């Protein structure tokens, strides 16, 4: 059996006031920042217990008038154990190109040679930013599903993360589903991570089946400590 999915995820941080070294109290202008990701996924059952999946995605980040774009893939496997309800999996996420910020905010004017005695000649220049790696992550996780009643079931999950840009950490969470339509979720991220910021998260979602397609709408609240409490709205579909 083959499964194909597509998804679009967006994060918007709202407007913030522009400050500079000359105007630390603000210039009167505002700026915003955000991220956008489009993804197409393919998975296949290799046996009745073992499956494999791959996702390709385009990632875009922007702040004020500058942006960066990159391409990455995710690879993962899933194994249904002989213990009823217990599943294990592993994955590699964000294996792809480097990203680099570009845009008119990085344009400036500079003198050709300040040591020359002639009148200064300013030319347009571009501030060259360094390319940066996507956060490559290796995950290993376990999940256990408990059927409470015909319409109600509970999922417990835990996974360990090994990233290329931070210390190792653990995520844990639970999901309660009603009639495979309404979902309530809660979890805790980045346990044991050094200098962690995010922590408790909670949210809900619904699953809609229309014709031969399935649509998912999910809302999430995340505690980001000193960065505030962002909210995420995710829309995805499978066909």
Predicted regions span which residues?
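Subset of outer-membrane beta-barrel
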Residues: 4-239
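Sequence context surrounding c-type heme c attachment/ligation sites in exported
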Residues: 1
């Amino acid at each position: 059996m083959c499964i194909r999915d597509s998804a679009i995820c967006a994060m918007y941080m709202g407007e913030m006031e522009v400050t500079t070294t000359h105007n630390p109290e603000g210039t009167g202008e505002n700026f915003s920042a955000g991220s956008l990701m489009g993804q197409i996924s393919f998975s296949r059952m290799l046996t009745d217990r073992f499956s494999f999946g791959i996702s390709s995605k385009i990632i875009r980040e922007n702040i004020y008038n500058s942006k960066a774009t990159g391409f990455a893939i995710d690879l993962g496997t899933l194994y249904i154990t002989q213990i009823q309800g217990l599943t294990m999996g592993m994955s590699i996420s964000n294996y792809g190109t480097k990203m680099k910020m570009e845009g008119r905010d990085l344009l400036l004017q500079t003198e050709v040679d300040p040591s020359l005695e002639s009148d200064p000649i300013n030319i347009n220049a571009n501030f060259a930013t360094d390319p940066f790696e996507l956060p490559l992550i290796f995950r290993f996780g376990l999940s256990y599903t408990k059927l409470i009643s015909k319409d109600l079931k509970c999922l417990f999950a835990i996974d360990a993360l090994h990233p290329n840009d931070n210390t190792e950490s653990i995520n844990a969470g639970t999901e309660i589903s009603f009639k495979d339509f309404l979902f309530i979720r809660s979890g805790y991220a980045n346990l044991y991570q050094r200098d962690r910021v995010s922590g408790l998260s909670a949210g809900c979602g619904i699953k809609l089946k229309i014709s031969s397609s399935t649509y998912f709408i999910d809302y999430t609240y995340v505690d980001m400590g000193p960065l505030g409490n962002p909210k995420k709205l995710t829309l995805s579909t499978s066909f």
